[in-house]
């Protein structure tokens, strides 16, 4: 427990075994996480990981998620977003390439891939939420003065000015 992260080989050495399943059984008992970066090569304990507001934690450029795999993490981020994500935005948050993962999730209908201004916007597979995300993104992109969509721990938040504009827009529809 002095070491924050470890590989399978390191864990085998500590446990005195050559068998992966022995390590997996022990990890299951200890409530552990597998990295979503570095091809899942690293492990950490739940009590060590200090997840941020998005559910991410890194140590020495190795990334972990409270949601588990890269696929599960991408779905959680997309579903939590108020305006969906472009692939580059999600890559900036997750610190790994996400294009293949997003294509797989879209083909499995776990998220929705929507064309928008010559790019793809990744949204929730839930139709009402997806509709809100697309509207929020369209409205956001129509406002040239806002600059890029905020990322990082505040990814769930749309600027107050945009929220006011969305409320005004929806009130005009009724």
What is the predicted role of each segment?
Residues 1-80, 84, 95, 103-174:
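Long, charge-rich, low-complexity intrinsically disordered regions
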Residues 90:
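Conserved donor NDP-sugar-binding/catalytic core segment of glycosyltransferases
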């Amino acid at each position: 427990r002095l070491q924050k992260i470890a590989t399978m080989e390191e864990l085998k050495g500590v446990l005195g075994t050559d068998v992966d399943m022995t390590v997996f059984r022990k990890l299951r008992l200890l409530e552990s996480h597998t990295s979503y970066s570095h091809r899942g090569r690293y492990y950490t304990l739940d009590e060590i990981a200090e997840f941020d507001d998005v559910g991410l934690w890194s140590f020495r450029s190795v990334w972990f998620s409270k949601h588990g795999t890269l696929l599960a993490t991408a779905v959680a981020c997309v579903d939590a977003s108020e305006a969906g994500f472009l692939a580059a935005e999600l890559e900036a948050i997750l610190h790994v390439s996400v294009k293949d993962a997003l294509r797989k999730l879209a083909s499995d209908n776990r998220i929705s891939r929507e064309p928008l201004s010559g790019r793809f916007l990744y949204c929730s597979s839930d139709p009402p939420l997806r509709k809100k995300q697309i509207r929020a993104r369209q409205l956001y992109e129509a406002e040239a003065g806002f600059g890029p969509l905020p990322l990082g721990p505040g990814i769930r938040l749309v600027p107050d000015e945009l929220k006011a504009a969305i409320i005004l827009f929806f009130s005009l529809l009724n």
